């Protein structure tokens, strides 16, 4: 386990990135969302490892995301857990849970995930997400 001081420093680095990621996601603002990522960017979900370059995340990509979320009645998501489990000066592992909500405030689903943030090109960004969401 990392020391309390290391975890506190990692939280100062990671939480603003995760907050910005969720804000961009909820707005379906592709540019804001991408600004929180490092590329290539990876997502492991439903047994499939997805790999995206910056150029892969375009209007067609966000349209697919919007359609998929609309199909489940999604309106917004919130973080319900963010715990630093491992950290260094170049990488942070964050055990997360997020909850998806409908417009009326009812829960669509809650999913556990692991987010890996890396320090590249002078900034922290999300490099990998491993999620139990579909």
For the regions a language model picked out, list residue spans one by one.
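Short, cysteine-centered beta-strand-loop-beta hairpins and adjacent loop/turn segments enriched
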Residues: 100-108
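Hydrophobic/aromatic beta-strand elements that line small-molecule binding cavities or substrate pockets
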Residues: 79-85, 97-100, 112-118
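A solvent-exposed, acidic/Ser-Thr-rich amphipathic alpha-helical stretch
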Residues: 30-84, 90
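Detector for glycine-centered tight turns/loop "hinges" at secondary-structure junctions
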Residues: 47-49, 105, 122
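Short beta-strand edge/turn micro-motifs at domain boundaries
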Residues: 108-134
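Beta-strand residues in well-ordered beta-sheet regions across diverse protein folds
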Residues: 94-95, 127
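Hydrophobic alpha-helical core bundles mediating ligand binding, dimerization, or RNAP-core interactions
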Residues: 18-21, 25, 37, 41, ...
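Short, low-complexity N-terminal intrinsically disordered segments enriched in polar/charged residues
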Residues: 1-35, 39
């Amino acid at each position: 386990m990392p020391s309390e001081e290391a975890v506190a420093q990692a939280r100062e680095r990671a939480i603003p990135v995760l907050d910005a990621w969720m804000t961009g996601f909820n707005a379906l603002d592709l540019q804001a969302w991408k600004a929180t990522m490092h590329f290539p960017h990876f997502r492991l979900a439903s047994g499939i490892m997805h790999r995206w370059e910056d150029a892969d995340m375009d209007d067609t990509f966000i349209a697919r995301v919007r359609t998929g979320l609309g199909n489940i009645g999604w309106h917004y998501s919130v973080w319900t857990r963010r715990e630093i489990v491992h950290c260094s000066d170049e990488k942070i592992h964050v055990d997360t849970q997020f909850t998806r909500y409908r417009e009326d405030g009812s829960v669509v689903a809650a999913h556990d995930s692991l987010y890996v943030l890396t320090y590249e090109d002078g900034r922290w960004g999300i490099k990998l997400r491993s999620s139990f969401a579909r």
